[in-house]
Amino acid sequence: MQKLQENDLSTSQTFKRLWPTIAPFKIGLIAAAAALVLNALTDSGLIYLLKPLLDDGFGKADTSFLKLMAVLVIVFIFIRGITSFISSYCLAWVSGKVVMTMRRRLFKHLMYMPVSFFDQNSTGRLLSRITYDSEQVANSSSNALVTIVREGAYIISLLAVMIATSWQLSVVLFIIGPVIAVLIRLVSKIFRRLSKNMQNSMGELTATAEQMLKGHKVVLSFGGQQIEEQRFNEVSNDMRRKGMKMVVADAISDPIVQIIASLALSAVLYLATIPSIMSQNLSAGSFTVVFSSMLAMLRPLKSLTNVNSQFQRGMAACQTLFDILDLDTEKDKGKYEAERVKGDVSFKDVSFTYQGKDQPALKHLSFDIPHGKTFALVGRSGSGKSTIANLVTRFYDINQGEILLDGVNVQDYTLSNLRTHCSVVSQQVHLFNDTIANNIAYAAKDKYSREQIIAAAKAAHAMEFIEPLENGLDTVIGENGASLSGGQRQRLAIARALLRDSPVLILDEATSALDTESERAIQAALEELQKDRTVLVIAHRLSTIEKADEILVIDHGEICERGSHEELLALNGAYKQLHKMQFNG
């Protein structure tokens, strides 16, 4: 059982882990980088042309050179436009591929996580990881990369132009460069921490909104609008405060860089007045090129400072995704597979405790369910009935003892094979936003014919409400069957189990959502379904399990009574008390 933890990796470590995801698309990166570098060179090239333009073109009134310059400007601008398109397209392609790959990888990983993981982590927070955090990765692999490569190449090319023109005036850059680098490194650490806080806040915001949307009827019924509004406002305000901290850090770093750069400009102007430098044939064109280059550096320096926050958001998002991907999926070490089991189920001294709980949910439980028999579990809420059903299918792994299926430990089966032998119909039915037919034949629609699906629906008395629908079995039922009643949804779940035809059937209060008339009809179908199968029934309504071969009364994780319906009534114990409560009011 795992709860999502936060690790603290450096930016380089995080990017090193992200690189294998980017590497398959590196051809796009290379093309984009080449285009960005060429784009930067055209900009710095235009500045470099100022020297001959001023010294030769205007200084010497060379009209032929001025005509050549006119052509060169057009060529440079054309190259700039082409390279801008290539870089934008290639980086959009790479970032889209990276985000898609990360989302697919995360989605697949979550599907194989144990049930205990979802007990410990909110759905809203996980949805935020799949949507918001994975999208943030695009910012680090595209927008930030555009700025880093292009502006970095631009600064380097401008520096080369300055040194080639007058290294004496350019030396001031080697003094301010390390100062700016230290500043950016300091701001990076601050942004990284603030970005992680922002991602956590987004998860909380999504979880809060999802909680209200899913429980909307409860909110309306109990007049909880003000409570939910207050809860959402608090989370929203917390996210706003954290966002403002990032803005403050960004706003402070930007003017500091600008001030340092302006000092460099002032230094260049001052150095130009020194006779020893003026005597080095410093022409008007040379000075204009150096000064213009330093002015031109202000924009890329500002961009590089600002992109740091964006890049750190992306790296922080990567880390939150890796936090999930580093968690272990369900333990599936079994090698045994059976084409079809008989269905003998045995619990041998089984004990189980939920993570974070002091008291065990089950204590030294032992019983055998022979093939073809129906065993029912009854007891008060929280006594451990549903836990027993979850252990058979290995949604949780036991702490002590063993559970056998046909004499083979369930731990020795592969998970997929074990679960093909078990059909579960629970109280909480989940249907998908798909057609009725696809929901009945979920995950195996190519395995069953249309006739088999119809037969299962008829056996579950579902065709009674399906046939009047305009599209019948091809009706799309909405998210979680929103267009159906509780009883109709339950009957589709029973039809799904009927179609699967597994030798072990687990009914976890399967008729709890049905009205009395529907329950009678379904009960007849369930009795037919239970023939030649091992059936474990968790029942709230005792009337549904009177014909069970044996009834186990569970109390505080232990079997306190067992026997047939008549035998347990004769004992005049816990079962008799439950029976009186239901039938005698």
Curated annotation (Swiss-Prot):
Residues 345-581 form the ABC transporter domain. It is found in: Cell inner membrane. InterPro entries: AAA+_ATPase, ABC1_TM_dom, ABC1_TM_sf, ABC_transporter-like_ATP-bd, ABC_transporter-like_CS, ABC_transpr_lipidA, P-loop_NTPase, Type_1_exporter. Residues 30-313 form the ABC transmembrane type-1 domain. It comes from the Bacteria. Keywords: ATP-binding, Cell inner membrane, Cell membrane, Lipid transport, Membrane, Nucleotide-binding, Translocase, Transmembrane, Transmembrane helix, Transport. Its EC number is 7.5.2.6. Gene3D superfamilies: ABC transporter type 1, transmembrane domain, P-loop containing nucleotide triphosphate hydrolases. It catalyses: ATP + H2O + lipid A-core oligosaccharideSide 1 = ADP + phosphate + lipid A-core oligosaccharideSide 2. Its main location: membrane. CDD domains: ABC_6TM_MsbA_like. GO terms for cellular component: plasma membrane. The chain crosses the membrane at residues 18-38, 68-88, 142-162, 163-183, 255-275, 277-297. ATP binds at residues 379-386. GO terms for molecular function: ABC-type oligopeptide transporter activity; ATP binding; ATP hydrolysis activity; ATPase-coupled lipid transmembrane transporter activity. It is a multi-pass membrane protein. Homodimer. NCBIfam families: MsbA_lipidA (TIGR02203), PRK11176.1 (NF008381). Belongs to the ABC transporter superfamily. Lipid exporter (TC 3.A.1.106) family. Involved in lipopolysaccharide (LPS) biosynthesis. Translocates lipid A-core from the inner to the outer leaflet of the inner membrane. Transmembrane domains (TMD) form a pore in the inner membrane and the ATP-binding domain (NBD) is responsible for energy generation. In MsbA the ATP-binding domain (NBD) and the transmembrane domain (TMD) are fused. This is ATP-dependent lipid A-core flippase. It comes from Mannheimia succiniciproducens (strain KCTC 0769BP / MBEL55E).
